Amino acid sequence: MQAVAPQPGDFPLPLRSLLDAGVHFGHQTKRWNPKMRPFIYGARNGIHIIDLDQTTRLFKRAYDFLTDAVGRGGHVLFVGTKRQAQDIVQEEARRAGMYFVTNRWLGGTLTNFRTIKQGLDRLRTLERMKEDGTYEQLLKKEVVRLEKERERLEKYLGGLKGMGGLPAAIFVIDPHQESIAISEARKLNVPVVAITDTNCDPDLVDFVIPGNDDAIRSIRLITARVADACVEGAQRRKDHGEGGQQAAGGGRGQRDEINVYQGGRGGRGGGPRQQQAS
């Protein structure tokens, strides 16, 4: 699928789209994190209602950051391992030419990237062996063993192929679910952009997007617009003649040379959930 950049001036997340997708439905009030209080409008039938004015304002901030990050030559790592997010994250990351993790986050994916890169090199070797006819010269038992190894590496590292170094940012579906990924990013000062539900700790996120991180329509809406930000940034880089390394979509995947984030941590900037999931 060819990525098409949004038109300049398009508002990233219209209020009507947020309502239709159920982005405003938080968790049960008894499951909330009090740090999310500034982003909560109220409660209805035991469910916290997220303040969508905050969502639109903070998403615009995140959108501008991501556009600038990619426009300067960086790449974004999309992370979403929960079942309802996996296909959406993979599809949108590929559309934007970005990297992704949709199965289990392997410890050290960022903090021990040298080991991860060894796995990526091994995956590339096995793919080459399969394509160039090497398998045909091996015993069937050996081919079966190598294929199992290749399939396992593809499952956990396939979305990182071509990634030569740290991303300029990570985009996360559910900080509570992806706590290890966020911990690694924070250790390395990699900015975190995240759909942050009412049970999450916003202090761990640089660019909070208050919203429902369980409903499929909510995840799809926000993830698609994050991908749009990346597409817009890539187009901006192309227009300015700053080259262009491709990511998971297939390309050189050189190391991101810059970290465009300036400033400290803290992206706050100043029943119905399951019904919305279909």
Curated annotation (Swiss-Prot):
Source domain of life: Bacteria
Keywords: Ribonucleoprotein, Ribosomal protein
UniProt cross-references to Pfam families, sorted A to Z: Ribosomal_S2
Gene Ontology process terms (BP): translation
GO cellular component: cytosolic small ribosomal subunit
InterPro entries membership: Ribosomal_uS2, Ribosomal_uS2_bac/mit/plastid, Ribosomal_uS2_CS, Ribosomal_uS2_flav_dom_sf
Keyword Acetylation: no
Annotated Gene3D superfamilies: Glucose-6-phosphate isomerase like protein, domain 1 (3.40.50.10490), Helix hairpin bin (1.10.287.610)
Chain residue ranges for the region called Disordered: 235-278
Biased amino acid composition, Gly residues: 243-252, 263-272
Molecular-function annotations in GO: structural constituent of ribosome
Membership in a protein family: Belongs to the universal ribosomal protein uS2 family.
Protein name: Small ribosomal subunit protein uS2
Source species of the chain: Sorangium cellulosum (strain So ce56) (Polyangium cellulosum (strain So ce56))
Lineage: Bacteria, Pseudomonadati, Myxococcota, Polyangia, Polyangiales
Gene designation: rpsB
